[in-house]
Amino acid sequence: PWGEYGVDVVLECTGAFTSKEKALVHLEQGAKKVLISAPGKNADATVVYGVNDDVLTSDMTVVSNASCTTNCLAPVVAPLHEAIGIERGLMTTIHSYTNDQVLTDVYHKDLRRARSATHSMIPTKTGAAAAVGLVLPELNGKLDGFAVRVPTINVSFVDLTFTAKRDTTVEEVNAIMKAAAESDRLKGVLGYNDLPLVSIDFNHDPHSSTFDATLTKVSGGRLVKVTSWYDNEWGFSHRMLDTAC
């Protein structure tokens, strides 16, 4: 009975009400808005804070905050697409295991997801790259990828390889990302790292994404590889609050 408690916005983090149709139950119980902490089917908008939150309007009632991986990827993709253009790209997220995985080998319709999260690197599907097209419509259908779940408890890593629309260099790519991280638009959302750090160093980092300039590669002028770290729990939680406010 949200109305009895004066609840304005429900942060839907159960994973059970991830479509607009299901999330409407919160509105029926008196809430005014619902923000889904996952990709949301038929949501009024899919938002990555700092990238397209300007699409929000007062009449929207059910909004998706996308996924933690989309929140890592989109702040990297947006400035690069603006500056040098992205024709097509493929992403891999090296992702810490989560609580929907199993700790011992069990039965599962997905045979890889049936395996112990603590014993293997587990390739699995993700819609994070494709979801960038909901945030940046000009890239709809141009990005794809998969995830590899690994036996670490927190912090994940996006590896994006793309074909640029023009020739570029490592130095230019890093300069674009450094400027983006310092911009009013992405300050606090996108970080920039040029030190030889590892995943644990980004635990409790509030950024959605921290670009790693030490790993940027360019081959033949137009084939570009970039990487970014993200605390898939803490950073995403901060963006839920930013979007809600």
Task: Describe the role of every protein-language-model region.
Residues 71, 167-168, 234-235:
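A generic structural signal for alpha-helix starts
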Residues 194, 231-232, 244:
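Conserved, well-structured ligand/cofactor-binding cores
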Residues 149-153, 229-236:
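Glycine-rich phosphate/pyrophosphate-binding beta-alpha loops
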Residues 62-63, 220-231:
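Short FAD-binding loop at a beta-strand-to-alpha-helix junction that anchors the flavin cofactor
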Residues 1-114, 218, 240-242:
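N-terminal Rossmann-like NAD(P) cofactor-binding subdomain of oxidoreductases
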Residues 164, 244-245:
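Short, hydrophobic alpha-helical segments
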Residues 1, 85-88, 93-224:
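C-terminal substrate-binding/catalytic lobe of Rossmann-fold NAD(P)-dependent oxidoreductases
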